[in-house]
């Protein structure tokens, strides 16, 4: 009679279970870390387990499997020789704002994960920080029956998902900042310049248009900041 292999869930942040697994490894036994969604360890609690195993001099072997980040990157048509992986962006507003500013300056292709109920918000944030014309591809249901890849620009995909309710988990592949000569103006600098023009007597809509052309931020967004 075949011995049944014990299966346990590992969701991270469980020190008791983590130490029990390490004890198994240190007793010269093996375990397999598997996932029902993507490659274990990539935006996954498995990373915590692998880190602990390496710290305790346990051998770790990876059998390559599917990964949404690289799969979406390959089919995006965007440059893939150099790219950066962001996973899910921070939820805390201050950290999220800083991360978005960093992404807006990034010359490499960037890969981001997002849930369906937060996708529109992410696209709106990317439109503000990166500009609505930044190239983008959004993939869902990768390697499955209803696989879908949508994209060209942030503006176009935002319009698409406003008309078609987002479903499934999304992998966003964002083109890099092609402006190599000059970095995009920071949000605070753009708003400071806008306020200076207003104080100098420039009309609000004219000032917003000028700073939009100079900074890359949308005129509508800049104008809205004047009335908050």
Which positions does each model-derived feature cover?
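General beta-strand structural signal in soluble alpha/beta enzymes
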Residues: 35, 62-65, 112, 138
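A contiguous loop/helix-start segment that scaffolds small-molecule binding in enzyme catalytic cores
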Residues: 29-30, 109, 116-228
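Short, acidic/turn-prone active-site loops that include or flank metal/cofactor-
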Residues: 7-15, 66, 87-92, 141-143
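Class I S-adenosyl-L-methionine
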Residues: 1-62, 70-71
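Short, hinge-like loop/turn segments at secondary-structure boundaries
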Residues: 2-5, 50-51, 76-81, 129-130, ...
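Short hydrophobic/aromatic-enriched beta-strand-loop microsegments
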Residues: 4-10, 60-61, 81-87, 133-138, ...
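Class I SAM-dependent methyltransferase SAM-binding "motif I" and its flanking Rossmann-like core
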Residues: 48-106
